[in-house]
């Protein structure tokens, strides 16, 4: 097995728990429409799917529906106002990042989230990744491997020397297509359409961030 020279992370549900702020934005919309807010535990599984997932969870509206565009824009406007109010790193992530630094292993973020939101959260949480590839960095979103390959190019490393951590089937699909080591995490959001992590054909499933260390 090739030694990992870089660890790349999905963002929402893998590196950071962004669900509280995402849920707050969509519940603000529900109140505006005269509806009761939904409990965060009902919305959490859809957080990794961003606006598309949360608008559908809160209003039953899909991207092909005529009202979707307006709802999506309202959601993004509300989210932009409080993008990192309650967002935090998952427990153990800060310790893992420090361990990677001590081993001279580089790390980065590859996410379908837009650059403006990702950079704002990184600034608030004082994160300084070695590379960043967002949903608007390449023409394709995960599960297409383009953003993962872009990150490897930024690091000037072969994809095979990188592992990619994620909490969704699309993350593992993208990692395999990019030629990276696919590593699933058990602490994320796990969209109901993705099935259980054990069905994703990941190299391993981590119960805690520090469980990655023996696999480096």
Predicted regions located by residue number:
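Conserved SAM-binding loop
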Residues: 15, 89, 107-110, 140, ...
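Small/polar loops that bind or transfer phosphate-bearing groups
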Residues: 17-18, 47, 109-110, 166, ...
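Asp-based, Mg2+/Mn2+-dependent phosphohydrolase catalytic module
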Residues: 1-5, 41, 101, 115-216
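N-terminal helical cap/lid subdomain that shapes the substrate entry/recognition surface
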Residues: 2-95, 103, 114-116, 128
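Anionic-ligand binding patches
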Residues: 98
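Residue-level detector of anion-binding/catalytic polar loops
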Residues: 36, 106, 181
